[in-house]
């Protein structure tokens, strides 16, 4: 690993520990030339995921786009920034496990809706209104009724 101050490639590892909930390794290093201490992170390299858009184009999966969209849906709710990032991490893990390098944007949207429905109904409605392009009150009402119906079914199954 190259030292950030003197660019020497010889260093020794002082400490290693798991980071990012086991997805990476954090290492404290010391340069053998100038004794500067620095931190590095090692992560497993994953194959890039292509998102197949509705118009037929492809783009690389962008985790930040999910964080931004979900953050907007979760404004003024109990979702913290950390919870949103954890939520996006879980969606990314599902995508990596379920896909073979390509996934449709509609599948990503449905994964988000499924997760938001369980976590926060307000965020679910907000995200659904943009994702499903609600045109009016009828769209909101039908989505609210489906939420209400599933809540009744869940309650009935518990009782």
UniProtKB/Swiss-Prot annotation:
Gene Ontology molecular function: ATP binding; DNA binding; zinc ion binding
Gene this protein is translated from: nrdR
Keywords attached to this entry: ATP-binding, DNA-binding, Metal-binding, Nucleotide-binding, Repressor, Transcription, Transcription regulation, Zinc, Zinc-finger
Note on how the cofactor is bound: Binds 1 zinc ion.
Listed cofactors: Zn(2+)
Similarity comment: Belongs to the NrdR family.
Annotated zinc fingers (unnamed), start-end: 3-34
InterPro entries, sorted: ATP-cone_dom, NrdR-like_N, RNR_NrdR-like
Pfam families: ATP-cone, Zn_ribbon_NrdR
Name listed for the protein in its UniProt record: Transcriptional repressor NrdR
Domain ATP-cone: 49-139
Organism, scientific name: Prochlorococcus marinus (strain MIT 9515)
PROSITE patterns the record matches: ATP_CONE
Function description: Negatively regulates transcription of bacterial ribonucleotide reductase nrd genes and operons by binding to NrdR-boxes.
UniProt GO BP: negative regulation of DNA-templated transcription
């Amino acid at each position: 690993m190259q030292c950030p101050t003197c660019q020497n490639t010889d260093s020794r590892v002082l400490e290693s520990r798991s980071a990012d909930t086991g997805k990476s390794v954090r290492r404290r290093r010391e340069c053998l030339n100038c004794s500067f201490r620095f931190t590095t992170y090692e992560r497993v390299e994953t194959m890039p995921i292509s998102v197949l858009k509705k118009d037929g184009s492809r783009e690389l999966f962008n985790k930040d786009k999910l964080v931004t969209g979900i953050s907007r849906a979760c404004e003024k709710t109990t979702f913290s920034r950390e919870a949103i990032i954890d939520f996006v991490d879980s969606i990314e893990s599902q995508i990596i496990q379920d896909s073979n390098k390509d996934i449709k944007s509609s599948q990503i949207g449905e994964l988000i809706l499924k997760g938001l429905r369980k976590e926060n109904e307000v965020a679910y409605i907000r995200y659904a209104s943009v994702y499903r392009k609600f045109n009016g009150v009828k769209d909101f009402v039908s989505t609210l009724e489906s939420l209400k119906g599933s809540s009744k079914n869940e309650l009935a199954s518990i009782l």
